Design a protein with these regions (language model features):
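N-terminal export/targeting and maturation segments
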Residues: 22-100
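N-terminal Sec-pathway targeting helices
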Residues: 1-21
Length: 173
């Protein structure tokens, strides 16, 4: 009788441990994703983000790209962060943003601040909101411009823009 219980208990224990491990792995990837450094916008061209980012980024002194893939149960999302730090060209970069987007090409026209950067969501018609969305952040103190791009084919709504940026870009800003 005891042997049959032991034969039954061990497989159940193994199954439970495997299920907990898989669940932990899925929760980790959902919250963290896989962050990779990207050397140029061409490496992320397949994601359709090239129209959002400035095409003259090679002209700036300090440009960094970071891509974050987050895997959910049956779908994935990608976020790309472009950080441009060039104090000498900072004012002209801001002017380029106004030239490209004006004052009205932003969702709700409501900027929000996160980590001393002022962000706005872009309503550029080429982005298929909410599945694709871009944010532009400006840090006056760092003389830095951030371009944040997000894609998730399964996303139906975003909610609060600040919470969205914190959830999806906190590790790359």
């Amino acid at each position: 009788m005891r042997k049959s219980r032991k034969k039954f208990f061990i497989p159940i224990l193994v199954i439970v441990l495997l299920a907990v491990s898989v669940y932990g792995f899925l929760v980790y990837w959902d919250n963290h994703g896989m962050i990779t450094k990207v050397d140029s916008i061409e490496e992320v061209a397949e994601y359709g983000a090239t129209d959002f980012f400035p095409t003259d980024y090679q002209d700036y002194n300090n440009v960094h790209f970071v891509k974050n893939n987050r895997f959910h149960l049956i779908f994935e999302s990608e976020s790309i962060t472009m950080k441009i730090t060039d104090p000498e060209k900072f004012e002209s970069m801001k002017a380029d943003i106004v030239d490209k987007y004006g004052e009205n090409d932003f969702f709700g026209n409501e900027p929000f601040e996160y980590k001393s950067k002022v962000f706005r969501a872009v309503t550029d018609g080429k982005l298929g909101y909410p599945k694709q969305i871009g944010f532009i952040g400006i840090s006056e103190s760092e003389k830095t411009i951030y371009y944040l791009w997000f894609y998730d084919f399964d996303l139906d709504s975003i909610g609060d823009m600040e919470d969205f940026v914190i959830k999806n870009f906190n590790q790359t800003i």
